[in-house]
């Protein structure tokens, strides 16, 4: 935040993490108060320091919150949210984040301050290791009208958050907690519609995996539809193979989508996949899960493609595929 006063405490707070590639935040001096005396400015600076020390201090101090009166709590909430930099310095501190979460939900009047600060800095707090939990807590304890406005922001920035190191973790927490049917379906649809992009992303793939674990049949089918034709490519990758395995475990249409992708690729590619570090798990799981009467056509389709190259698969020590093929008597 731009500030006319020169007061700086950067030496005390030089451990604060960078936020979205900005310089590390420091506790700035209070905004200019026009005709206020130097005494008033210095007092405001001391108040900020006291708030910071309390909020980021030892865990042993957190019990002190319960003995604070309403007026003091309101003063604290107002002061720590009066400037974006003040707020971020506290929320990006591990203890500061935990203490702030304890203050949230104590009164609607206090929550107004916290809500407005979060909304002003939404992307910043959602992509920080500790500050993101402040937003998550707000979505748990704020009144419905405030939560809905926060949900709207989540929908707007879902893909961006999914591709961020800490944003993806926060997004997964929110997906787990979200109990509003409308917003839940909207968020799952965003993940499903962007499944290919997210599955190939270093962090986004964790969101796709998380959503598949929820076993929401509609969303799982939508993800399978978006990944149709790309399952082989994903199976060569560590985290991509996890997503493909989740689709196989879902059974029905998602499983058929994966196996048909395997059968559609060239034989050379299929054998290379079956011998690869991650792909062999996908092929093995496809064989294990389709070896039932209802999916026998898929199973024998794979077996017939792989059987002539069984000798090559024996050379892959990690693979159980050759063992499965050896145990089979494929009908003519």
Swiss-Prot record:
Residues 1-329 form the PUM-HD domain. It holds the Pfam family PUF. GO terms for cellular component: cytoplasm. Gene3D superfamilies: Leucine-rich Repeat Variant. It is found in: Cytoplasm. Sequence-specific RNA-binding protein that regulates translation and mRNA stability by binding the 3'-UTR of target mRNAs. This is Putative pumilio homolog 16. The gene is APUM16.
């Amino acid at each position: 935040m731009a500030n006319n006063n020169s007061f700086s405490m950067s030496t005390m707070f030089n451990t604060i993490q960078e936020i979205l590639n900005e310089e590390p935040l420091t506790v700035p001096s209070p905004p200019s108060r026009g005709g206020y005396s130097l005494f008033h400015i210095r007092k405001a600076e001391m108040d900020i320091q006291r708030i910071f020390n309390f909020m980021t201090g030892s865990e042993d101090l957190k019990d002190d919150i319960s003995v604070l009166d309403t007026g003091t709590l309101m003063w604290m909430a107002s002061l720590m949210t009066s400037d974006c930099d003040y707020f971020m310095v506290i929320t990006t501190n591990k203890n500061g984040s935990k203490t702030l979460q304890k203050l949230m939900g104590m009164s609607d009047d206090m929550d107004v301050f916290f809500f407005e600060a979060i909304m002003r800095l939404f992307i910043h707090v959602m992509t920080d290791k500790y500050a993101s939990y402040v937003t998550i807590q707000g979505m748990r304890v704020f009144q419905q009208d405030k939560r809905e406005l926060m949900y709207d922001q989540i929908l707007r920035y879902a893909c961006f958050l999914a591709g961020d190191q800490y944003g993806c973790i926060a997004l997964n927490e929110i997906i787990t907690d979200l109990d509003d049917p409308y917003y839940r379906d909207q968020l799952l649809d965003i993940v499903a519609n962007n499944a290919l992009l997210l599955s190939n992303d270093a962090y986004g793939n964790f969101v796709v995996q998380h959503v598949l674990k929820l076993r929401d049949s509609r969303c799982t089918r939508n993800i399978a539809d978006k990944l149709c034709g790309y399952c082989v490519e994903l199976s060569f990758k560590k985290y991509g193979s996890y997503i493909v395995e989740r689709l196989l475990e879902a059974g029905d249409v998602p499983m058929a989508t994966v196996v048909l992708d395997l059968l559609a690729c060239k034989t050379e590619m299929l054998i290379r996949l079956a011998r690869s570090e991650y792909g062999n798990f996908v092929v093995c799981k496809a064989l294990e899960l389709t070896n039932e009467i209802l999916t026998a056509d898929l199973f024998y389709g794979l077996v017939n493609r792989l059987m002539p190259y069984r000798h090559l698969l024996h050379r892959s020590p990690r693979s159980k595929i050759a063992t499965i093929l050896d145990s089979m008597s494929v009908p003519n």
